[in-house]
Amino acid sequence: MILYASFRTDIPAFYGEWLYNRIKEGWLLQPNPMNANQLQKIESFNIEAIVFCSKDYRPFMKYVKWFNDNYRCIFHYTITPYDSDIEPNVLDKESIIENFKELSNATSKEQIIWRYDPILFTNKYTSEYHKEKLSIMSNELCDYTYTCIFSFVSTIYPWVKKNIPDLIDDYKNKEELLEYINSQNNLHYQTCGHGDEYSSLYPNIGISSCTSVDLLEKVFNIKCIEQKGGYYRKGCGCIQGTNIGQYNSCLHGCKYCYAARNTYKQTLYDPTSPILLGELKEDSKIYPCKAPKVFKKEEQKQLSLFDFI
């Protein structure tokens, strides 16, 4: 199985100790986001690869070597150009860029992916602003990654517009920026969650597929079992896996975030608990995780049971 850590919160930034403890212990419990009393039991020896996603890996660096030695790992690193009006708790961008380089050197250029995600437009954050920042940041990072993934902010959630009152849904801004990205050749640019909406018009922009069979096969020089469906939403080409983490627990406070309207759950955090946030209740029902296998049997890399003794 592929373990995604996580689409719902920032585990490397805030909950890395918990994940390290649980994987070494041999199992963890993941609540159903629609029913917290239903939990999946995820066992470490079933994990074939881990896909991390974070805005700040600095607190996680002490665990990177262990994870990278024992699992096939992909690291998505989100670095965007916004100030405190949009990302109030993600301020030290220069230090984060240096950490991106450190993480790349500790793993490999192939394993780390830069996410310039999401792109939003306001009177302040125009296409010209994004072009300037993309140019600066891509020149900084192109020696440490091959890929930049981007998307445009989703406005289907009403609180996003409420949090960013001057948000502009401007086709001209978007078109100008897409033309600029399409002209760049220092990185491979591809979208997230947009399918081939832009790649059909801009041939140098790749189809949405942040964690694909092609990526895993190229990075780890392996063959994957043929995958049928399992994509997370329309326009998503990611390989099916198990997503851990819980909503309303990320402390970055980003105004565009769909996963954290508040942070009250963070107070329930216990790094020694089998559940990221909260406690196991007497009436909880635990089911085995049924995520599909990804790698062909002879090519799987995973811990043996003896590693947990």
Locate each region found by the language model.
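N-terminal [4Fe-4S]-dependent radical SAM core
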Residues: 1-4, 43, 204-247, 285-297
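Conserved Radical SAM active-site core
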Residues: 1-76, 80-86, 100-104, 263-309
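Flexible, acidic/Gly-rich N-terminal and inter-domain linker regions that tether
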Residues: 164-223, 275
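Surface-exposed cleft-lining segments at the edges of enzyme active sites
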Residues: 82-90, 118-128, 162-172
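Active-site beta-loop-alpha junctions enriched in small/polar residues
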Residues: 8-10, 55-57, 78-82, 117-121, ...
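Local cysteine-cluster metal-coordination motifs and their immediate loop/turn environment
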Residues: 242-262
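Conserved C-terminal portion of the radical SAM core fold
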Residues: 95-160, 180-194
